[in-house]
């Protein structure tokens, strides 16, 4: 389970330390790919394989399906953590997410996201502005 928000440095080689609390869930490997809203998404390999099966089962006659498959699969990088608990984010993915020397790693339960700090601040501002909508969603769940 991925929970919390962490700020970490990206070194000159593009390596990013994964939060210690996330590492056990990534022992089997991690897949990083393009995410929504110009971030990156990270998945444990088993969760990625489940998602890939489901997305691959969608009808390819649909333009939306093809675009989703391109977004997820064409930029995906399958990797393992190094001894220091870091991953090497490929240059094309760093450029996509506009990552510099800092990144925010945000846990989202079954996966995590990697954000440029400036973009993450915009996400937090939007969440604040939509708090009442989120409360309604929780009410729909009878929570």
From Swiss-Prot:
One of its GO terms (molecular function) is transcription cis-regulatory region binding. Pfam families: MraZ. Keywords: Cytoplasm, DNA-binding, Repeat, Transcription, Transcription regulation. It is found in: Cytoplasm, Nucleoid. Residues 5-47, 76-119 form the SpoVT-AbrB domain. One of its GO terms (cellular component) is nucleoid. GO terms for biological process: negative regulation of DNA-templated transcription initiation. It comes from the Bacteria. Forms oligomers. Belongs to the MraZ family. This is Transcriptional regulator MraZ. It comes from Roseiflexus sp. (strain RS-1).
């Amino acid at each position: 389970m991925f929970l919390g928000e962490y700020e970490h440095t990206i070194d000159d080689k593009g390596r990013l330390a994964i939060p210690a609390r996330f590492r056990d869930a990534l022992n089997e490997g991690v897949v990083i790919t393009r995410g929504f809203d110009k971030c990156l998404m990270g998945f444990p390999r088993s969760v990625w394989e489940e998602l890939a099966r489901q997305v691959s089962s969608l009808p390819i006659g649909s333009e939306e399906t093809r675009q989703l498959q391109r977004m997820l699969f064409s930029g995906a990088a399958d990797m393992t953590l190094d001894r220091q608990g870091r991953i090497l984010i490929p240059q094309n993915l760093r450029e996509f997410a506009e990552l510099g020397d800092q990144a925010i790693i945000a846990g989202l339960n079954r996966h995590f996201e990697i954000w440029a700090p400036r973009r993450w601040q915009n996400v937090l501002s939007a969440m604040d502005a939509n708090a009442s909508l989120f409360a309604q969603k929780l009410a729909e769940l009878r929570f």
